[in-house]
Amino acid sequence: LQVFINTVLGECWEETSVEVDKFDDEQLAHRAEHYKADLPEGVLLLTAAVDVQEDRFEVEVRGWTRNYESWGIYKTEIYGNLIKDEPWDELEEYLRTTFRFEDGRELNIAGFGMDTGGHYTNKTYKWLKLQKKRGKKAYALKGFSRPGEDVQLLHKRSVVDIKDEIKGKMVVVDKTVLYIIG
């Protein structure tokens, strides 16, 4: 029904369930938890997810506890012409950020996944391969997109080609592992 209303009628879907709470900006701001440091106590591991857009990277850092509870630690956007190396270098630098607890202890991002299913796919594969060679835990990710099939959190991984243009032709120069996620 929601798809029909949005796409066929061109109207905005409005959730009518009594379970849906509606908050204004002030109410949401009041509910936010504030910490005196980058990291709340209990975070043991940091991961990052990178979404590649046409003109930017959207990065979210999450902190994880022993029981898989997670906190959104920080979100940022890195703008630039992704055909050039500068935004990729800026992303690499950001992923080396040190985050701190209130008592001064520090934690770095342990690993990151990067969406490869949209813009700059081949460049993303190459960049991730370089990060792995530099010792980073870097994972190529793609969202599951087969209508009608059950969505699982993690699907079978696959091996994909990394290509380069050589003498005007796209040629396979390497391979990398791609993780399909739900």
Roles of regions detected by a PLM:
Residues 52-55, 62-64, 112-119, 141-146:
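An acidic- and aromatic-residue-enriched active-site/binding cleft used to recognize and process polar
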Residues 30-34, 44-47, 96-100, 121-127:
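Short alpha-helical segments and helix-capping/turn motifs at coil-helix boundaries
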Residues 13-18, 52-94:
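Metal-dependent catalytic core segments for phosphate chemistry
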Residues 118-182:
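Metal-dependent DNA phosphodiester-chemistry modules and their immediately adjacent helices/loops
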Residues 80-111, 127-130:
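Short, basic/hydrophobic alpha-helical segments
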Residues 44-47, 56-60, 69-71, 106-113, ...:
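Beta-sheet entry/capping signal
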